[in-house]
Structures are given as structure tokens and as C-alpha cells.
Amino acid sequence: MTQWYPASPALWQGRDDSIEAPDARRLFQTVTRSETFFPENWQQKIALMGFACDEGVKRNSGRPGAAGAPDALRKALANMASHQGHERLVDLGNWVAPTPDLEGAQQALRDAVSRCLRAGMRTLVLGGGHETAFGHGAGVLDAFAQESVGIINLDAHLDLRQTDRATSGTPFRQLAQLCDAQSRAFHYACFGVSRAANTQALWREAQWRNVTVVEDLDCHDALAQMTQFIDKVDKIYLTIDLDVLPVWEMPAVSAPAALGVPLIQVLRLIEPVCRSGKLQAADLVEFNPRFDEDGAAARVAARLGWQIAHWWR
């Protein structure tokens, strides 16, 4: 059974500059850490949750280690300066999945996300492999059953694989099938796709599903496509697979990208999403601390989470 644990206070440590001025604060001083999972106490806040699971990566023949990412990313976030929006972060702990029960873990995350959103929170989830996206996305669909939900994925991979069981490569096919079962439209956009990393069968599936696809080569000029997608939906779930970044910026993932989309371009693409007033849920997935020798990759990933919380409207 998937277990919930509060985040350790030892993760939220950093440099104390408060002697300089009252507003010389860092995230470890402004994030609220909860000892219980009770989102109803935190309306209008951002639920920071970890999904400590990489069973989907293992099933997808990837490099395991992403289960250790949530706490590594908390440590990287802790010492970053606290600015507007960061005081809304409430650490609601980790969902820890026992191997090999991926399906049970995804259901636990789905229920937790739905509960947070229905309580008036927003969710920022630290994965975990990209299997995180099915649990997270399903929770968003559950919470907004009467509204159109747009799924925006920044990723080198379409993750529309067809297999006999869930993996880190299947979450968006699973979400599409969930939408089919609920007789609702599947709104999915994937930015940063590597044609070299996706078979013709996956491209065909994306075309059949009417997926908005922007290749890595074209992301430097994709703001118009992002805006068009934002405009056509009521609510948005944003998921960032860190392998969308080039290997020289993000080596610490299961499948590093030879080309990728540079961090500055990723930030410019997600800014209008965060400021749209429609973003309800976001996650960072596939970070693997086993391949981060000096913590630099963790800081890259944490900067994305920091920026999302800062821009979130």
C-alpha cells in the first residue's frame, strides 16, 4: 500500500540572512511544512507534494533513481530566495510507493490531487518518473469534471506508448483513454518533442488524437501555439519532463536529450501558462539524483519549480 509521510524538517534548511532585513528570506523560512495531510486547512495555497516512485521508469527499461527526487529537489529549493508567491507553498509531504505497485501509487496520488483541488488548493508535485502524470492528471480531471482540461507537456517524448501495463511512457495514452471513458475531449499539447526519440507509430497516435505537437527544433518560436492552446481550455495541468532540457543542462534524467530545449526557452514557454489564471496543477518529473554529481542539475530543476510558484496566478 502506498504510504504518506510528512517531509523531514531537515530538508528545509538554508542560509539565514534575516539580520539584514525583514524581507531577506529564503524558501526554507517561508514554506509551511504540514505534519498531516489535510488540504482543507490550506485553501488558496499551493500544495507541494512528492511522488516517490520510479516503478514506471523501471518498467520502461529506464534508469531508476527518480524515487529519490522529491527530497533532493526540496533541498535545492530550500536555499532559494523567497519572493512573491512563494509564501503560498505548503509542503504536504511525500507519497511513497512500494515496488511494484505502480497502479496503487497512481490511485493514491490521484485521490490526493483531487482532494487538494476540491479544497481550493493548487498542486505542485515533485516526481518521480513520468508515471506521475497519470495520477496527477487523473486527479485534475476528477476535480474539474464539468470543465475542459488542457494538458501541457514539455518533453522530448510523446509518452503515448501502448503496452500491457502502465509505465513512464504511457501516461498520456492512459489519460486519453480516461477521457474516452468519460466522454470528454482530450486536450493535449506536447512541446519539445524529439523526432529522433519517437517512432512513427507514436507520431501516428498523436495525429489520431489531435495532439498539438511542437518539435524541439521549433520551440524558439512557439509562443503563439502555446497561447492558442491556453485559450481553448478552461483549466490547465502543466507537466515538465526534465529530459526536455539538453544534456548539458540536465544530465540527471533517465534519458538525457542530445538536442533538447534550453532552460531559457522552457521558461519563456511556461510563463504565459503560469500567468493565465487557468493553471491548477504542475509537476516536475524524471529528475534522477543518482546522476547529479555536484547538485547543479537539482538547482536547474528547482529553478523551474521556483519560477512556477512565483509566476502562478
From Swiss-Prot:
Residues annotated as binding Mn(2+) 1: 130, 155, 159, 241
Enzyme Commission code(s) on record: 3.5.3.8
The keyword tRNA processing is assigned to this record: no
GO biological process: L-histidine catabolic process to glutamate and formamide; L-histidine catabolic process to glutamate and formate; putrescine biosynthetic process from arginine, via agmatine
UniProt-listed InterPro entries: HutG, Ureohydrolase, Ureohydrolase_dom_sf
Keywords of the record: Histidine metabolism, Hydrolase, Manganese, Metal-binding
Disulfide bonds: none
Protein name: Formimidoylglutamase
Organism annotation: Salmonella paratyphi C (strain RKS4594)
Highest classification ranks of the organism: Bacteria, Pseudomonadati, Pseudomonadota, Gammaproteobacteria, Enterobacterales
